[in-house]
Structure formats: C-alpha cells, structure tokens
C-alpha cells in the first residue's frame, strides 16, 4: 500500500518533501491493515485458547471480589455521574460477595487545597452512603486521597496517580495503616476478606454477570497462579485476567479515527471464544489496565 501510494504520487509529479508526507500518512492505515491481516491469519491457523472455568451460581465467600474505579473528583456533577455509573455496574452484577468502590484523587494543583474540595468530598461521601442505604450496607465504598507535594512535578497531586491508587489500595486490603487514603466510606470490616479486584475505568461498562464469570475462571484449579520463589513472579496459571474489551457503537461512530481503530464494536452474544494473538501464541497477554487480578 505504501509503495503503491508513493509510486502514484511520483508519477503525478509530487516533489520529494510532499512524497515523504504521503508515505508517512499512508503508513497509518497500512500498519492497521497489516495487523488485522496477520491476526486473521493466525486465528485461522491456531484456534482460540479457551481457559477452563467454573460455572458458579454466585461468587463464593472465599473469592470475595471488589470492583474498583480509579478516578479524579473535580466537581459535584462528576461525583453524581460516577455514583450513577457505579450503581449501574452493581445492578448488572448482583452478588452478596461482590462490592464496588471509587478510588479517587483531586485534580493536580499548585496548592494543597482548592476552594470547593470540601464540597466535592462531602458530595462523594453522601452519594456512597446513599447507595449503601438503598442497596446493602456493605455494597459500595469510597477511598479518597488528599494531595501530596510532588517535588519533580512541582505540583500537589495524588501519589503516582492511578497506579499509586491501586498499589495503596492493595496494601490497605492487607491491613496497611500508612496509606494516603484519608477518607474511607463503607463497611471496612470486609476489606481483609477481599481476594480479587476488578479494575475499571470510569467509562468502562461491566456486562451483566461478567464479574462472576471472571471469578469462575480465576478460581479454576488449572488457572490458579503459582509464584516462583526464586524469580518472584507467576510462572504457572494466571494472576491477572483481562477480558475482551470492545468499543460501544456510539464511541466508534465519533470520528473516522475511532472507526478505523475501534475494531469489532458492541457485544456479540453468539461469540463463544475470541482470538487474541498473544494469548493464543504464548499463553499470556498485554494488560491494558482493565480486568481482574489476585490481590495476593
């Protein structure tokens, strides 16, 4: 494709600078087309690797799971959006041993406290408490961190942003008392019992019963993670599961660029197994920040 575009441009009198730009612009669709063709070829040569799973009626107490949404609280309106989003995910995944939490920071700032911070935090706490009154007392949580001074960035911000929130939350689940989560709303007594976390972005939807299905996969004996004491990493089984992530029809139609890179959109109820090139070839994939992981 690139060679054809270059030859066409040269025949029609394009100069070298313009020819270079044409080649560069052609590389984007050409690379995407090449990737799609290679993945389709591999999917025909190697069948999708389907992981064994348990057909669970509900999440067992020994596999208590919490869905976490790391995010930024920058307004009261944003708090309302997040609370509504969390409630929708919970209604699609009803289970007494499945919980939902917001892990939040304030936006980066040049000062430690901004006007309106207290109002936002009060609204967030009230929203989580209202959800617990409406549904169950141990269903929803809020874990919020105040800003810390970052010498390198020259800003007041949440420590290590998203990665820091998740890392500190894992420590909090294992009884750490020195995290920067200064505001904790919800029934904290269940935290030591949490075995798995499902991390989502604030714009990610969790399909109906998807959490239970993920737990059914990770708890299957053949999938349980084995950590090599010498290497200090998982050498057998899986410590992280990442389900297929697809783009909604509305998001894919947002622009030509989105249409090009969104791939298969929506949810296909008739698909039983989906090919992933890395998983099918190597038995492992690339984690993009959305999925289930074993806390331990």
PLM region descriptions:
Residues 51-296:
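Internal catalytic domains of large membrane-associated glycosyltransferases
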Residues 22-47:
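Transmembrane alpha-helices and immediately adjacent membrane-cytoplasm interface residues
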């Amino acid at each position: 494709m690139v060679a054809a575009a270059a030859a066409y441009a040269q025949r029609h009198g394009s100069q070298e600078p313009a020819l270079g730009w044409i080649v560069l612009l052609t590389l984007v669709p050409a690379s995407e087309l090449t990737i799609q063709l290679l993945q389709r070829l591999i999917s025909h040569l190697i069948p999708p690797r389907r992981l064994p799973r348990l057909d669970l009626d509900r999440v067992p107490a020994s596999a208590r799971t919490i869905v976490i949404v790391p995010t930024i609280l920058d307004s009261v309106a944003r708090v309302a959006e997040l609370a509504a989003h969390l409630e929708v995910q919970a209604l699609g995944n009803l289970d007494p041993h499945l919980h939902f939490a917001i892990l939040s920071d304030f936006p980066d700032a040049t000062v430690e406290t901004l006007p309106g911070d207290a109002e936002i935090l009060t609204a967030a706490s009230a929203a989580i408490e209202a959800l617990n009154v409406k549904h169950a007392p141990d269903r929803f949580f809020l874990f919020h961190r105040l800003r810390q001074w970052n010498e390198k960035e020259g800003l007041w911000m949440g420590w290590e942003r998203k990665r820091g929130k998740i890392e500190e939350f894992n420590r909090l689940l294992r009884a750490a008392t020195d995290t920067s989560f200064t505001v904790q709303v919800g029934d904290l007594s269940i935290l030591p019992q949490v075995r798995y976390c499902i991390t989502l972005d604030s714009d990610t939807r969790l399909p109906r019963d998807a959490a239970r299905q993920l737990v059914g996969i990770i708890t299957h004996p053949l999938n349980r993670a084995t950590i090599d004491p010498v290497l200090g990493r998982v050498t057998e089984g899986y410590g992280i599961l990442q389900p297929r992530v697809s783009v909604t029809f509305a998001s894919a139609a947002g622009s030509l660029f989105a249409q090009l890179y969104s791939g298969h959109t929506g949810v296909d109820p008739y698909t039983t197994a989906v090919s992933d090139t890395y998983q099918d070839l190597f038995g492992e994939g690339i984690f993009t920040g959305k999925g289930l992981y074993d806390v331990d």
